[in-house]
Amino acid sequence: MLSPVSRDASDALQGRKCLRPRSRRLPLPAAVRAHGPMAELTDSARGCVVFEDVFVYFSREEWELLDDAQRLLYHDVMLENFALLASLGIAFSRSRAVMKLERGEEPWVYDQVDMTSATEREAQRGLRPGCWHGVEDEEVSSEQSIFVAGVSEVRTLMAELESHPCDICGPILKDTLHLAKYHGGKARQKPYLCGACGKQFWFSTDFDQHQNQPNGGKLFPRKEGRDSVKSCRVHVPEKTLTCGKGRRDFSATSGLLQHQASLSSMKPHKSTKLVSGFLMGQRYHRCGECGKAFTRKDTLARHQRIHTGERPYECNECGKFFSQSYDLFKHQTVHTGERPYECSECGKFFRQISGLIEHRRVHTGERLYQCGKCGKFFSSKSNLIRHQEVHTGARPYVCSECGKEFSRKHTLVLHQRTHTGERPYECSECGKAFSQSSHLNVHWRIHSSDYECSRCGKAFSCISKLIQHQKVHSGEKPYECSKCGKAFTQRPNLIRHWKVHTGERPYVCSECGREFIRKQTLVLHQRVHAGEKL
């Protein structure tokens, strides 16, 4: 049954017939069936909600007729309806469409052939087309099933976690209710438990992230009690899978399958066995450039833009191009300033949920990614990749003006603005322009200071800065150097101080070779060579 908002949205999007493949009937709780609008259903339909009632499907041709505003409206309404079903505590298998919808992709576009074949497959299996039969979709892994618990159930699960924290892995995930609102993962009745380290995960995306560490990792759904001690690739190296033809080693079956597909043009055997996300009886499409395999032709087409460099989606604000529509959608939040995801610990806001999840590791102290060279740990994969450039010394991006080399293309683009004088980021309040968006964000705090210190009246743009500032008045210095005992109000200050003991000076002047502990000191020093006034 569509909500009033959904009806208005569907009316706005109609004007042509909406195609609806493979609906699912979802069993409602008894309390919901006995009261409210659902009680008015006929005997044959009572107690069931057809998934198509809250989900509208389009053919590819129909989807192309919608403008950007209509597509955004559709995306928001469908997620709202999905959240409504989830709040009822209904258990159902999640289709590929819903999973892609949560990631901001376009899974709701179906070809007529796909819809027909789906119905025929259900009929051949002796199942009533359009019904949920308590079994998984044959195109979806059994581990992709979902159980969305009600609010009271999640509170019970949180209480259990708080009373039985993991002794080995440290802090548990906090604010589950808050993260569940935005998280793309699936909440389970029982958490996934790592048999080697005892770490627990409520969401399958956290499950996958832990599983796909640089050293690998394998998790197991928690069994009764706290046993289930099995091997975990994060803590214990796992045996590799070797390709007999290509003589290459792989840590996962999916990697071996894709590698073997690149060596052979033979079609896969007709089998219904599901191996690491690939249905062996299903034809898949292989990229001619890198050999990566995909189950859908349109997914392959999107992937090939990486090799061709095609970027069909343009930002009408700054003219920047993107290869994926979702990347454009995320980029546009830079111009709108929208930051909907807030950290409950320090009040900091983020444009993307991934940024919030990564930031929360600062508070929990969780560091998942380890460098294989020096053993140093990092809270995010991107930070690990940037760190590894220190060991490889690779600097493939060279400035055509001065010959300076950079390890990242983005850093080269920022550097080139020092030659061109380009300052694309302008403050709408005072007109001052900046070469980097981060500099504009720092400057904007002058105009939008919301948090004021009650002791001295100084204002700050976010509550985390105010909390740090208040330590100046209280004299609190929780971060102490284990070498000399000197204490600091902030952790970054302790990290910089520690370099005095280690002798580490990572920032080197390319002109004279002088080394510095802090990057800011190097920047000030380089102005001497440039002839700028300090």
UniProtKB/Swiss-Prot annotation:
It is found in: Nucleus. The lineage of its organism: Eukaryota, Metazoa, Chordata, Craniata, Vertebrata. Residues 49-120 form the KRAB domain. Belongs to the krueppel C2H2-type zinc-finger protein family. The gene is ZNF671. Its main location: nucleus. A zinc finger (C2H2-type) spans 192-214, 285-307, 313-335, 341-363, 369-391, 397-419, 425-447, 451-473, 479-501, 507-529. GO terms for biological process: regulation of transcription by RNA polymerase II. The keyword Cytoplasm does not apply. Disulfide bonds: none annotated. GO terms for cellular component: nucleus. The keyword Repeat applies. Keywords: DNA-binding, Metal-binding, Nucleus, Repeat, Transcription, Transcription regulation, Zinc, Zinc-finger. One of its GO terms (molecular function) is zinc ion binding. Gene3D superfamilies: 6.10.140.140, Classic Zinc Finger (3.30.160.60). This is Zinc finger protein 671. May be involved in transcriptional regulation.
